[in-house]
């Protein structure tokens, strides 16, 4: 019990800036230690054939109300819609914007590369070789069940039972995004736990587990792998990074197991990521095979309602019926189409339609834009 109190109190003191409700997450691209990847000199160059879209323009022009600050639509191998109204504080940071939970999907994408590079055998392995999980319900589970948010952890964390995806049993200062995962797993509240009946349960701990397991398996090659994914494979133009769970002044205390899914990139590099995923799928690369495998093993969300969130707002998260490998699938009304969705707090969206070759990338300060009009309507076009 003393250990539990000490760790949680220390976490509260060191990370008080970021322990507000998830809905009030501040813009802080440089406040935390990073796993940083530099831009490629051979970055992917887009072609454009721009058209004006009145619906998108209206939402962008009214960004103070809608929250929409960036919209990109890519199809026919060209950027067709490109509109933005970035605040100055984002512009002076080279247009860098947070992924929020879009980063969950990017962790999976990196994990797929780790499998392709031979660091991890496959998605069906059992997690019995990592001491960090000792004593917890996660020890001995299959990797695919963690990928699918299907680990039977709903009594302890997640949106199935609690009001947050990142706080253990909804306790404000037990935010798994703000202290190393080994510390989280050693808390009394997670020790000697048993899994419940598996059910889709969206939460941040599963993703941070995946990321730190990948760090563990890659060892000294972790940042080399990140460079291979984003610099060499995606060919980003500018710096991108994952935040760590420790702030800069505190990073030396925890040299390992500090991975978290919070990702930063500019708008065009998010599109480059989407384009690379589209190409992986279409060209049946090793990573493309990974994406197809998690698509085949996706599970039902079994939500009571698909009528938006508690505020009546929609996105790919709330308007899709299945989940696989940290991605949203089976958009309502389009379930026959192979559409992969990434979704983050505040309306961040990266959506890839493998059947049409269309990619939509959206960034917002909050989710009050008309998602059905500027995203879903575009997806329905053939």
Identify the role of each PLM range:
Residues 117-154, 191, 205, 218-260, ...:
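Active-site helix/loop module of the DD-peptidase/beta-lactamase fold
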Residues 93-94, 159-247, 261:
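Catalytic-site signature segments of enzymes, centered on catalytic residues
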Residues 17-92, 116-121, 148, 216, ...:
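N-terminal leader/targeting segments and the immediately adjacent pre-domain N-terminus
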Residues 206-213, 261-283, 348-364:
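Active-site-proximal alpha-helical segments within enzyme catalytic domains
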């Amino acid at each position: 019990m003393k250990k539990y109190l000490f760790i949680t109190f220390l976490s509260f003191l060191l990370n008080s800036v970021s322990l507000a409700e998830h809905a009030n997450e501040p813009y802080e691209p440089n406040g935390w230690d990073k796993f940083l990847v530099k831009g490629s000199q051979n970055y992917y160059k887009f072609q454009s054939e721009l058209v004006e879209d009145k619906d998108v323009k209206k939402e962008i022009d009214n960004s103070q109300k809608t929250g929409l600050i960036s919209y990109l639509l890519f199809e026919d191998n060209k950027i067709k819609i490109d509109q933005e109204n970035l605040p100055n504080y984002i512009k002076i940071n080279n247009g860098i914007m947070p992924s929020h939970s879009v980063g969950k999907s990017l962790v999976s994408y990196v994990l797929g590369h780790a499998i392709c590079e031979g660091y991890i055998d496959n998605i069906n392995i059992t997690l019995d070789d990592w001491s960090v999980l000792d004593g917890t319900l996660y020890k001995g589970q299959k990797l695919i069940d963690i990928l699918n948010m299907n680990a039977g952890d709903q009594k302890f964390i997640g949106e199935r039972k609690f009001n947050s995806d990142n706080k253990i049993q909804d306790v404000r200062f037990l935010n798994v995004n703000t202290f190393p995962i080994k510390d989280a797993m050693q808390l009394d509240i997670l020790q000697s736990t048993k899994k419940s009946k598996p059910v889709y349960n969206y939460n941040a701990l599963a993703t941070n587990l995946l990321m730190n397991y990948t760090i563990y398996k890659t060892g000294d090659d972790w940042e080399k792998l990140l460079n291979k994914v984003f610099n060499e494979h995606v060919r980003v133009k500018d710096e991108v990074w994952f935040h760590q769970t420790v702030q800069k002044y505190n990073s030396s205390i925890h040299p390992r197991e500090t991975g978290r899914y919070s990702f930063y990139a500019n708008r065009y590099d998010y599109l480059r990521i989407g384009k690379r995923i589209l190409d992986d799928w279409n060209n049946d690369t090793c990573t493309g095979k990974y994406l197809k495998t998690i698509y085949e093993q996706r599970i039902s969300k079994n939500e009571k309602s698909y009528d938006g969130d508690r505020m009546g707002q929609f996105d790919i998260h709330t308007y899709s019926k299945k989940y696989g490998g940290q991605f949203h699938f089976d958009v309502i009304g389009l379930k026959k189409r192979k559409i992969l969705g990434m979704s983050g707090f505040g309306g961040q969206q990266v959506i890839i339609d493998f059947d049409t070759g269309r990619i939509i990338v959206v960034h917002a300060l909050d989710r009050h834009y008309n998602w059905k009009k500027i995203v879903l309507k575009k997806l329905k076009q053939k």
